[in-house]
Amino acid sequence: VLGIPGLFSTLGLRQTSDGMTVHGGEGTLDIVIRMLAGLWGAGRAPIAVEFAPLTAGQVIDAGDFTIDCFPVRHRDTDSFGFVFQSPARRRLRPHRLMALGVPDGPLRGELAAGRPIVLADRTVDPEDVLGPPSGGRKLVVIGDTETTEGLSQYVADADMLVIEATFLDRDAPTARNYGHLTAAEAASFAATNKVGQLVLTHMSGRYEDEEILAEAANIFPNTRIAADFDRIVL
């Protein structure tokens, strides 16, 4: 949230004509609106901006993937986690296309899109030539949260889980007081829900990253610490 004014300023200097929609809980949006108004005046942000309140269970269609929003508990804030999911796709099976005499070209595109085609001597249904679903990916991002209770339904079998790990387990009482998780809790949650990879964020400056990583990796080996400009392929 605190980085939004800087982002807006940069985009304004570039004289972008694109607008931006800020999604968030009511409390979060109120903070953003007041920050922007304090810097540039009410309704005078350097780029066009809209504000879209989030609700639990809301699904945003982003074209190639969907974003599912779910509530998480972090003190008295209206915080959310997010499931980014791309659909599994069914690919054409070349040997079936050849066996049924489907030529290269637009007809194969019709079948790939799930529509039957008519040849000179037969009708070919997509089910005749499509393979099983494959390739869908699931990324779950959870920021500040004081508990993972009730979140397994969103996280189970994710290819990647990005989640906070503010404290070490030796400071679990402090984590409870401030509404955060320990590295061990984050790792145990990942292991229980059979995620593919765990990426940790929001570590307290009182620890070295290596300490956080060691505690988590002891429970869930496929763990890494998030860093600016990371690129990770799911």
Task: Write out the residue ranges for each language-model feature.
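Histidine-centered divalent metal-coordination motifs
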Residues: V1, H74, H202
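Hydrophobic packing residues within well-ordered alpha-helices of enzyme cores
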Residues: I4-L7, V32-L36, L151, I212, ...
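Short internal beta-strands
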Residues: G19-G27, V162, V199-T201
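A glycine-rich helix N-cap at a beta->alpha junction
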Residues: G38-L54
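Active-site-proximal loop/helix segment associated with metal-binding centers of metalloenzymes
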Residues: F65-V141, T145-Y154, M160-V162
